[in-house]
Structures are given as C-alpha cells and as structure tokens.
C-alpha cells in the first residue's frame, strides 16, 4: 500500500495497514513526517484527540510515529506524488522527482494538499525578522510584545499559548466575529490577551527587526502605534491539490469526493482525512483517524484477495492499537 501524505491520518493509516499485514510506503512532499502539524503547529496544544485531554502537536506526531514504526513502513519524504498509471492489479505513482512506486492500492491522506500561508496585506518585508506565519517554537517569543493577526483557531490557539511567556499579546481581527472554537475564544477572553476587533495592521516598522506596529480601527479610521517584536500572521492558507487534479478524481472545492468506504471512484484509489469530501464531513484529526482505518480495511481485499474487510480487534492478538 502507498499512502500519499504523512500527516496524522497517513501515519495512523500506515500503522493500521501494518496491523493488517501489508507492506506500506508513505510519500510526502514535506521533508519531515507529520504534515501540517509538524510544519506549522508543533507547539499547538490539541484538545480533541480521544484519550488525550491535551497534547502538543509534536508529541502527537511522535506517538503516531512510534505506533506506525512497529511495522517498519518506508518513508519517501520530499517526494510529491505527481503521475498515476494503472497496471494489471496495481497502480504506479511517479513523484515529481521521478521516483516510481508500484502499489496494489493508494490511500491519499494529503490534508490541505499543496498549501501556502496568506500574507499580511502590508507585505512580507519583515518575514523572518519578526513576521511569522506560525510558531514552531514558543520560547523564541519569551518576553516579547506579540501581535497576533486573525480570527480563526490558529490565531486564538497561538495567542493562548504565547500569553504565559510573552510580555504582552494583542490579537487583532478585522471583524467582531471569530471562526475559532467558542471554548477557545472564551479562554482567550478570560486571559490577559488584549483583543482588538474591527482592527487591521496598517504598517510594520523596524529596520533589522520589527520594533512597532501601526494599527487602524477600520470603522473610525483611528490609528495608533504600539511596540512589537513579533507579528504572527494567522490569516489562513491558500491550498490546491496540485498534480492530484490530473488523476481523474471527483473534486469538490479542492476536496476529493469519497463514498462511505473511502473509495474515490478511481480504481484502487482511496482517500481519508481533511482532503476528503462527503455528506456530513467534519474536518478533525479525530475523524481522520477513523477514515484512515475505514480506507485501509476496505482496501485490504485489493491487496490480498483472501483478506476480509473486518480485521478483528487488535486486543485479540496483542498488537498495539
């Protein structure tokens, strides 16, 4: 089995395929396993994983790697899945770097697909000099005045994570309604984080490093300047499926349409996780785990015709799950 995407759903799928006795390879365009969690949210605390009241992103990925590595999957990192060819009883996936992988089944767990952060409207002149899109290491911002821009989960999560170590945290959003989970919004509102609504960043000042930020109140036009050594632009990401759009998959708003078995409609191609679309779809890491198991189990008879869809329980044979 080839799993395209080494994020949480892909890593759990690799474990589950190994548990089912399959040999597994994971292909990902990123240089490290863990997908968006490793690349963007390693310090973010995740609260909605079953059995884990709170876990940092990097800790979750470390645990998933330990679980998957019981069955020694092959990691093909820095390789973007590009071309698909069908052979008798198999498919061949060629990466953008020319690596060819033959597999009985492919499970796509590519998350957002190819993604790029949305820049601040003021530009990227201070990128790497105080302007960041995500916070891979919290302690870098110890004692700083931090401006977090955005109204979604990432903005509120980072504001909450930075509040205990930063000198000050200000969250600015151009509206007075937020996309973030209500419980997180309430926690930020109860903290020392200052929330400024109907506010945008008008200008970032500083020579070698950010020194101050000019904010504008969009309803009144009033401007004020406050000190800042860091600006976290949590404005979301633009994403597309890249070469996967050439695989004859059914696409709905940058997501791959699947049926209840996680099959895509293209022979021997399944999908799971945030990249999928079906009626009632909820995009959570937690649901991605179940979708990965569903995809692997339904794909199992294509790998081994004698295999059953239902695998039994891991507790029956002592295999960790």
Curated annotation (Swiss-Prot):
It catalyses: 2 reduced [2Fe-2S]-[ferredoxin] + NADP(+) + H(+) = 2 oxidized [2Fe-2S]-[ferredoxin] + NADPH. Its EC number is 1.18.1.2. The keyword Flavoprotein applies. Binds 1 FAD per subunit. InterPro entries: FAD/NAD-bd_sf, FAD/NAD-binding_dom, Fd--NADP_Rdtase_type_2, Ferredoxin-NADP_redctase_2. Gene3D superfamilies: FAD/NAD(P)-binding domain. One of its GO terms (molecular function) is flavin adenine dinucleotide binding. FAD binds at residues 28, 36, 41, 81, 115, 274, 315. The keyword Flavoprotein applies. Keywords: FAD, Flavoprotein, NADP, Oxidoreductase. It holds the Pfam family Pyr_redox_2. Its cofactor is FAD. It is an enzyme of class 1 (oxidoreductase). Homodimer. Belongs to the ferredoxin--NADP reductase type 2 family. This is Ferredoxin--NADP reductase. The lineage of its organism: Bacteria, Bacillati, Actinomycetota, Actinomycetes, Frankiales.
């Amino acid at each position: 089995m080839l799993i395209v995407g080494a994020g949480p759903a892909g890593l759990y799928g690799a474990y589950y395929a190994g548990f089912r006795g399959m040999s597994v390879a994971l292909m990902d365009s990123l240089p490290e396993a863990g997908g968006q969690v490793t690349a963007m949210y390693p310090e973010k605390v995740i609260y909605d994983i079953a059995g884990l009241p709170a876990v940092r992103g990097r800790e979750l990925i470390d645990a998933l790697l330990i679980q998957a590595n019981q069955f020694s999957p092959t990691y093909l990192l820095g390789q973007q899945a590009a071309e698909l060819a069908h052979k008798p009883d198999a498919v061949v996936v060629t990466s953008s770097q020319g690596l060819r992988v033959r597999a009985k089944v492919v499970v796509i767990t590519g998350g957002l697909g190819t993604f790029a952060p949305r820049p601040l409207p003021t530009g990227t002149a201070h990128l790497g000099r105080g302007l960041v899109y995500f916070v891979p290491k919290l302690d870098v911002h110890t004692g700083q005045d931090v401006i977090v821009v955005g109204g979604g989960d990432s903005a509120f999560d980072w504001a909450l994570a930075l509040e205990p170590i930063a000198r000050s945290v200000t969250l600015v959003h151009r509206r007075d309604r937020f996309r973030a989970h209500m419980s997180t919004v309430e926690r930020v509102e109860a903290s020392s984080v200052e929330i400024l609504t109907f506010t945008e960043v008008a200008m970032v000042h500083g020579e070698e490093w950010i020194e101050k930020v000019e904010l504008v109140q969009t309803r009144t036009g009033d401007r004020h300047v406050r000190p800042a050594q860091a600006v976290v632009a949590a404005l979301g990401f633009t994403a597309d499926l890249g070469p996967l759009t050439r695989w004859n998959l059914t696409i709905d708003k940058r997501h791959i349409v699947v049926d209840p078995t996680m099959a895509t409609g293209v022979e021997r191609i399944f999908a799971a996780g945030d990249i999928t679309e079906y009626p009632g779809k909820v995009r959570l890491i937690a649901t991605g785990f179940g979708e990965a198991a569903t995809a692997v189990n339904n794909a199992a008879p294509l790998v081994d015709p004698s295999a059953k869809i239902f695998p039994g329980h891991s507790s029956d044979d002592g295999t960790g799950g």
